[in-house]
Design a protein with these regions (language model features):
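Radical SAM/AdoMet-radical enzyme domain recognition
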Residues: 47-67, 71-188
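A short acidic, helix-capping loop that chelates divalent metal ions and anchors anionic groups
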Residues: 35-40, 126-132, 194-198, 278
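Accessory C-terminal segments flanking Radical SAM cores
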Residues: 193-308
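A short, compositionally biased micro-patch
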Residues: 19-21, 113, 261
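Generic start-of-chain signal for non-secretory N-termini
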Residues: 1-4
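Canonical Radical SAM [4Fe-4S] cluster-binding loop centered on the CxxxCxxC motif
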Residues: 6-47, 269-270
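Residue-level signature of catalytic and energy-coupling elements of molecular machines
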Residues: 18, 185, 264
């Protein structure tokens, strides 16, 4: 039976952070809502531990798994992690979010190991702006996207976080790029997670005006019911999804996600770190699968109807 919280929301998606390490320094990164580790106390789950938790989640009828970070591809054993998850019967949608800088190197072996698709974070198509925002090389990301498309990590999704006064004039360019590469564009509104208040106030902008223009051009508008009711605009040559942050009432109302932090804690809410459920310690102390299942159920019981701030 599908896991449901006390408010009737099914839990269908598992996001597994495999590391908090990253090879970029993006000023806007929210790290999946995870707090930075105490210096010298970095804990990461092993490939076997990650696979075991995914297997238990699948037994609870969670079918969609996404690997996140940090940057998943900085883990030297990332292909092993992907391979172990890829062998689990019952995983329907298996994807990864990456900054793309190492994707050209890993795309083929990840696909062969069982990864189905990737989301690539790409806030801009301008080399100088990309370098300023992330400290990285845009060429590496573009090469990674091209390689992901070539090997069949389909569909490739492009995550464009829209920042006021920085890249909000590039949306049309990014739509054209998505059309040219055969990718799906996701426009993402800045969220106030792990960010200084002044940064959020300075760079946040609503996406409502983009949605008005997208609706005018769309051949069809689709609503993804189990993905925060986000809207998908089918344009003549591209597909664009619009992702609003936590202030959007649909965000919590239709949340179907459970997260696992890189140090092995179940995270019921993206915005909170005061209701985590530790599963790594019990696993390392010999807990059975049934006992870990009960910890999953406890995490789901801790889900609230909405984030209260």
């Amino acid at each position: 039976m599908t896991l449901k919280d006390n408010y009737g929301r099914p839990v269908l998606n598992l996001r597994v952070s495999v590391t908090q390490r990253c090879n970029l320094r993006c000023s806007y990164c929210h790290r999946e809502g995870q707090e930075l580790p105490v210096e010298g106390k970095v804990i990461e789950m092993t490939p076997d531990e990650i696979a075991r938790l995914v297997r238990i989640a699948v037994n609870l009828e969670i079918r969609n798994v996404k690997l996140t970070g940090g940057e998943p591809l900085v883990r030297e054993d990332i292909t092993e992690i992907v391979s172990k998850i890829g062998e689990i019967s019952g995983v329907k949608d298996f994807s990864m979010t990456t900054n793309g800088t190492l994707l050209a190197k890993y795309a083929e072996e990840l696909h062969e190991a069982g990864l189905k698709r990737v989301n690539v974070n790409i806030p801009t198509l301008r080399v100088d702006v990309y370098s300023k925002l992330t400290g990285g090389s845009l060429d590496n990301v573009l090469n990674g996207i091209g390689e992901a498309v070539r090997v069949g990590l389909y569909p490739v999704k492009l995550n464009m976080l829209v920042l006021r006064g920085v890249n909000d004039g590039e949306v049309e360019d990014m739509i054209r790029f998505a059309a040219e590469t055969g990718a799906i564009l996701q426009l993402i509104e800045l969220e106030p997670i792990n960010l200084p208040d002044d940064y959020y106030r300075r760079y946040h902008r609503t996406l409502d005006d983009y949605e008005v223009r997208l609706k005018e051009k769309a051949l069809k508008v689709e609503t993804r019911r189990f993905m925060h009711n986000r809207r998908v605009y089918h344009l003549p040559k591209a597909k664009v999804e619009v992702i609003h942050p936590i202030e959007n009432t649909e965000f919590c109302l239709h949340c179907t996600r459970l997260r696992i932090t890189s140090d092995g804690k179940l995270k019921p809410c993206l915005m909170r770190n005061d209701n985590l459920v530790d599963v790594l310690t019990p696993m390392r102390n010999g807990a059975s699968d049934k006992e870990i299942e009960e910890l999953f159920r406890e995490a789901v019981r801790r889900r609230e109807p909405y984030f209260k701030g």
